[in-house]
Amino acid sequence: ETEMRFIQNMGQLFQKEEEANGIVRNIQSALDEGIAKAREAPARRVITSEFMRDKIEVFGDKLLSGDIIRKLGSTNIQFDTPFISREELRMCGADTLFIVYHGNEQEGANALAQIQVPEFSDIPAVKNGRVFLLPYRNVCASHVYTAQTIREISNGLYFY
């Protein structure tokens, strides 16, 4: 809702209300489609994370990706802090992982390689091939990418 309000406000500010309303309709449509598909599938236990040099950041309920995951009927695995250890990730029991990355496709491949190591091979999501990439721009202040982000998360949750 916050993303949609922001887009509508920007549309008013720049006198582009019709364009803004079209973007908002697209976001709502993506959300409605995802919710309908979520009703037909089991809820997932999800972690959205970003590998940093020496730590792992977790994107929980309070961020856009977490909000989308909840709206699509799944659960974000919660931690007390925004950063977790490799051991906490290994023991989390997530059946779906979204890995956030910055940059181009090669950066995405590098981020994905962080989870595809023997240390994490027992995580259900890794075992079952349910690890998906999300570009950073799509999960933090996504605005015009919000509908795309909803579709990417929905596909990861329910189509693989």
Model regions: which residues?
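Structured C-terminal subdomain patch of bacterial secreted/periplasmic proteins
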Residues: 2-5, 12, 21, 38, ...
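Structural motif corresponding to alpha-helix initiation and N-cap regions
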Residues: 82-86, 117
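Proline-aspartate-enriched helix->loop->beta-strand connector
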Residues: 86-99
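A residue-level marker of the well-folded mature domains of exported/periplasmic proteins
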Residues: 10, 15-17, 58-59, 69, ...
